[in-house]
């Protein structure tokens, strides 16, 4: 077992030195990247901006786990990395891949150390209630140098003689949770950008709109399965491919002779087609010339002869 002979003063100084770099990154860098740098570097149209804002309202279980998310993002970005692309989605997604990967490893390390300390915590020790641990919203309002002091004061107020190992465990759990909540925004932004590279910004915008509509519809009035982006984009891809592979056996519509419509009229109570030849009318008045017969079409001999 460990022989920890540390006074509260040295414990505080040591912990401040250990966690300063981690807290500096987790509490300052992540919010700045997700707000100042992101909002100033990225320009999108109004529809894409609204869809991106709606991403923050989607449930947590909609997004993949951190490990799967980073792996999928790297697969989507690899062709653009090889071609040295400078598209906005490539640049921002690359930044978030590095950010999430580094901070996720740090957070996982905190959890592993905390779990290893659990073995040396006295069995009768009561865990620190969540209300005594600093939350993410509170950490944004506390100066970075005072974060450890505020957390230590809360632990002392819970139990003045709280064991040293249990204090370290409580600090690690609090800071790891702050890191995870800080990375949640970056995780959603990374999902948005690498999917825009895979499917197109317009398709992702349409998909988010349909998904939110499905989520807001009561269960008995909506479909059983949520819409997927593959189902939205597949018909368009198939239609485009079909146009290229058609053999063209059918004549274009514009080159086909238009069939003349046969109009009919009613004459004296019977239907007659205008396209049919009309018969020569019989003389009805006195003095009208008699119609020539078909045999008299040739010219009569001149009377001079």
From Swiss-Prot:
Removed propeptide positions: 273-305
Stretches with biased composition (Basic residues): 258-277, 295-305
S-S pairs: none
Pfam family, one: Hepatitis_core
Keyword vocabulary terms for this entry: Host-virus interaction, Secreted, Signal, Viral immunoevasion
Region (Disordered): 226-305
Subcellular location: Secreted
Signal peptide limits: 1-19
GO molecular function: structural molecule activity
Positions of the record's site feature: Cleavage: 272-273
Gene3D superfamilies the record matches: Viral capsid, core domain supefamily, Hepatitis B virus
Entries under InterPro entries matching the protein: Hepatitis_core (IPR002006), Viral_capsid_core_dom_sf_HBV (IPR036459)
GO CC terms: extracellular region
Function: May regulate immune response to the intracellular capsid in acting as a T-cell tolerogen, by having an immunoregulatory effect which prevents destruction of infected cells by cytotoxic T-cells.
Subunit relationships: Homodimerizes.
Family per record: Belongs to the avihepadnavirus precore antigen family.
Protein name listed in UniProt: External core antigen
Organism of this sequence: Duck hepatitis B virus (strain United States/DHBV-16)
Lineage: Viruses, Riboviria, Pararnavirae, Artverviricota, Revtraviricetes
Originating gene: C
